[in-house]
From Swiss-Prot:
It is found in: Cytoplasm. This is S-adenosylmethionine synthase. GO terms for biological process: one-carbon metabolic process; S-adenosylmethionine biosynthetic process. InterPro entries: ADOMET_SYNTHASE_CS (IPR022631), S-AdoMet_synt_C (IPR022630), S-AdoMet_synt_central (IPR022629), S-AdoMet_synt_N (IPR022628), S-AdoMet_synthetase (IPR002133), S-AdoMet_synthetase_sfam (IPR022636). Disulfide bonds: none annotated. Keywords: ATP-binding, Cytoplasm, Magnesium, Metal-binding, Nucleotide-binding, One-carbon metabolism, Potassium, Transferase. Pathway: Amino-acid biosynthesis; S-adenosyl-L-methionine biosynthesis; S-adenosyl-L-methionine from L-methionine: step 1/1. L-methionine binds at E58, Q101, D252, K283. It is an enzyme of class 2 (transferase).
Amino acid sequence: MLNNKRLFTSESVTEGHPDKIADQVSDAILDAILKDDPNARVACETTVTTGMALIAGEISTTTYVDIPKVVRETIKEIGYTRAKYGYDYETMAILTAIDEQSPDIAQGVDKALEYRDKDSEEEIEATGAGDQGLMFGYATNETETYMPLAIYLSHQLAKRLSDVRKDGTLNYLRPDGKVQVTVEYDENDNPVRIDTIVVSTQHAEDVTLEQIQEDIKAHVIYPTVPENLINEQTKFYINPTGRFVIGGPQGDAGLTGRKIIVDTYGGIARHGGGCFSGKDPTKVDRSAAYAARYVAKNIVAAGLADQCEVQLAYAIGVAEPVSIAIDTFGTGKVSEGQLVEAVRKHFDLRPAGIIKMLDLKQPIYKQTAAYGHFGRTDVLFPWEKLDKVEELKDAVK
């Protein structure tokens, strides 16, 4: 008999992973600037490696931010507070190399500076995209958060791994860690069980592998994963190399924007290639990806599809998206053409329209930079709102 089961795997990383440190530092700097200057232009890249961080990019702002102070506070919050961890917020070196935004880019983004503080139609029309590019948003009804199960559980496990470190439950854990979850789907594409869970966590030198494996199951996996999804066939790989003492930036260099699949949908949807962290909302890499998730989530919540992927594309200096594409993977209750028309009618997808619609000039970005930008249960981001459901239903009647 033919076995129609299907496996799909996604991963997440903890806030102490080198690439995630870089994302959080970039977004902490962005938030510090937006708090005093909501109209600032920020493109902030971070590199972390043993004993140092490099902050580079283009920033145009009317405010002053003590960048080294922001960096140190962020590293401290993550948990790199002792030299024996291989990275220490107090003693690390911090290099900065910041320029202003290119005037060639700026003139395409804001032709109408006189409308800068007004939400007028003229300002929205005059604000062009900060770059060309394509962005995707996705939603599915397989979880209550409208996220794929594998990435949702990966984030929940990674967050739990950090929580039990920070609250002292497992005080031998260190900040770096990774999680991977493999979900089995039945022939109707419904998730039925967890096939494999991988957890790799940095730890103190004096703890045994057996204790780590026992504690991670008891304090991280079992309290997080619904018991009906785990059975005797579920495989657990906990620190499968046997040792993970050297970690964080001492073990691997980290860079902003290197965890774009972790940040989004765990590989189940397509990705346009642009990262989010360190970018102000005039950068459509970030704001349009948030808008695309907002659109897709409302379509699925409205019952118009079981799965939905939305693609938006832009030209630099042009306000209107050059294309809007929707794929419901055969699960749509109405045609994809009808959905596109409804989206054009009820969502303003011009860059300034997105910023206004989702209130994106707020300093909310640091909290997005670990454990996913979408489907979070610990914080409600504006692009997760379900306030367009009735409008979409009415539009396709």
